[in-house]
């Protein structure tokens, strides 16, 4: 089965006021690929997109979507959702460490391109919006 997953990421920097002047910012910044590792597999009739999230990073629950060319793709999320107080979004649900998107009836997407979009941050340093 062949399903293409395209990731949508943009990039901007938020420099924290709490960083010490003695710490090099460049040594602390991770790329989006280092912060969020994505794996795709099939399990029975489910397509599973696993995201391993760096220990200093997180993904906003409300800024996560999966679409094909025509519509939103329905999925279940498996992961530990917690809430943080964010200076830009206020009280925000996020995922840390890992999460899985389980897409039922994966046969529906054979030959289609799925677009995964998400927004996440490296704590107090940089955000990677989708």
Regions found by a protein language model. Name each.
Residues 10-18:
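Hydrophobic h-region of N-terminal signal peptides that target proteins for export
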Residues 2-5, 17-130:
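Extracellular/lumen-exposed scaffold segments
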């Amino acid at each position: 089965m062949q399903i293409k997953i395209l990731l949508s990421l943009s990039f901007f920097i938020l420099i924290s006021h709490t960083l010490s002047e003695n710490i090099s910012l460049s040594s602390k910044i991770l790329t989006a690929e280092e912060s969020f590792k994505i794996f795709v597999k099939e399990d029975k009739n489910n397509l599973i997109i696993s995201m391993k999230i760096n220990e200093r990073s997180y993904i906003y629950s409300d800024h996560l979507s999966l679409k094909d060319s025509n519509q939103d793709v329905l999925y279940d999320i498996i992961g530990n959702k917690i809430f943080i107080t964010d200076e830009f979004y206020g009280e925000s649900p996020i995922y840390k460490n890992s999460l899985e998107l389980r897409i039922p009836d994966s046969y529906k997407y054979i030959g289609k391109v799925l677009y995964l979009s998400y927004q996440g941050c490296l704590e107090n340093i940089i955000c990677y919006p989708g």
